[in-house]
Design a protein with these regions (language model features):
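Short amphipathic alpha-helical segments
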Residues: 24, 50, 189, 218, ...
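Conserved N-terminal alpha-helix of the aminotransferase class I/II PLP-enzyme fold
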Residues: 9-60, 85-92
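Conserved PLP-enzyme active-site core in the AAT-like
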Residues: 51-252, 257, 268
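Positively charged, small/polar-rich N-terminal and surface patches that mediate targeting and assembly
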Residues: 8, 34, 194, 255, ...
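Short, well-ordered beta-strand elements within core beta-sheets of diverse protein domains
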Residues: 222-231, 279-286, 341-346
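Conserved small-domain helix->loop->beta segment predominantly found in fold-type I
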Residues: 241-309, 326-332
Length: 364
């Protein structure tokens, strides 16, 4: 582990050449670090990309990508259902640089072409979406982006490269919050963007000067975590699918959503582009906001926190937490209903997970 802020040189000539980029000597950990590069190389290989750059968090990777390729007067087209902080970037911060955005319906990609403008420079989406678990057709969007020569960027956090490979469907760049499934135990923050070498070079130049660098210690943790990603995801998927099937049709629920349930609106698309359905499920409590709070307070084993992808099962109520700053109308526009519960299904025994949820539902 190279836990250092900077690197030493044997002589002035080597130092000069490093700054002139005529040798590959590391200079400063904000620029590059061998431990960080090891993690980056593993993620590049898993995604089938050409290159990558690791950041301090998933949001640092997203913002760094936006700022690298967008400028004043540009337009970005995104799926309507996005993570709360990404929505805040679009609505609060991007307008400061005169960057406009449009939201496309996640279940109607055919309507997206009408939203493309002459100044549209990027199509951005996440699939499955956070927190609604909508599935966006990567193949259709990839063809649309290629047709109009627009940069196509995918947040692959919920699926990981173990379950989904967006580059195969035409994505130019793939982003992860490595904090989630990549870490797998809720220990460290991290983010990464991978893709075409020339595009990553531009992101690197922006980020080395603005400073969203990944800690070498965090990179070491994440790199070690990748060694168990496959076996962990199998158990997460097994548990999530079993839980979704147990809860489907429960009288207290208005619906259960999981990409590999046949009842999911985009089930066929999910089967086409994902190896398995992932480790998250959502369900809608018929009692709305009040039932959501009651349910969360009634949980005994399951952890209440805003993270996901942990070894332990985690529940969250987006309407009162991650998306609480949105108006009721804005919440609905991105798929957040008052009684929506998101469950990141852990590695525990499935009967224990289901038992805790069922006893909490009895109190709603």
């Amino acid at each position: 582990m190279f836990l250092t802020s900077s690197f030493c040189f044997d002589n002035a000539e080597d130092m000069r050449d490093a700054f002139n980029e005529t040798n590959d000597h590391n200079i400063y950990t904000r620029f590059s670090n061998p431990t960080v590069q090891e993690f980056t190389d593993k993620m590049v290989a898993l995604e089938g990309a050409e290159a990558g750059f690791s950041c301090a968090s998933g949001m640092a990777a997203i913002f760094g990508t936006f700022m690298t390729f967008l400028q004043s007067g540009d337009h970005i087209l995104s799926c309507a259902s996005v993570f709360g902080s990404t929505h805040t970037l679009f609505t609060k911060y991007m307008p400061k640089w005169n960057i406009d955005y449009s939201y496309g319906e996640v279940n109607d990609v055919d309507s997206w072409e009408a939203l493309i403008k002459p100044n549209t420079k990027m199509i951005y989406l996440e699939t499955p979406t956070n927190p609604g678990l909508d599935v966006v057709d990567l193949e259709k969007v990839g063809k649309l982006a290629k047709k109009h020569n627009i940069l196509f960027c995918v947040d692959n956090c919920f699926a990981t490269p173990n379950l989904q490979l967006p580059i195969k469907f035409g994505a130019d760049l793939v982003i992860h919050s490595a904090t989630k499934w990549i870490d797998g135990q809720g220990r460290v923050l991290g983010g990464i963007v991978v893709g075409k070498k020339d595009l990553i070079r531009e992101i690197y130049l922006f980020c080395r000067n603005t400073g969203p660098s990944l800690s070498p210690f965090n990179a070491w943790v994440l790199s070690k975590s990748l060694e168990t990603l496959d076996v962990r995801l199998e158990r997460h998927c097994d548990n999530a699918e079993a839980l979704a099937k147990k809860l489907e049709g429960h009288p207290k629920l208005g619906g259960v959503k999981y990409p590999f349930l046949p009842s999911h609106p985009a089930y066929e698309i999910a089967k086409k582009q994902m190896r398995r359905g992932g480790g998250l499920i959502t369900f809608e409590l018929k009692g709305g906001l009040e039932s959501g709070v009651t349910f969360m307070n009634a949980l005994q084993m399951i952890t209440l926190t805003s993270n996901l992808g942990d070894s332990r099962t985690i529940a969250s109520h987006p309407a009162s937490t991650t998306h609480s700053k949105l108006s009721a109308a804005d919440q609905l526009s991105v798929g957040i209903t008052p009684g929506l519960i998101r469950v990141s299904v852990g590695l525990e025994y499935i009967d224990d997970i289901a038992g805790d949820i069922l006893q909490a539902l009895e109190k709603c």
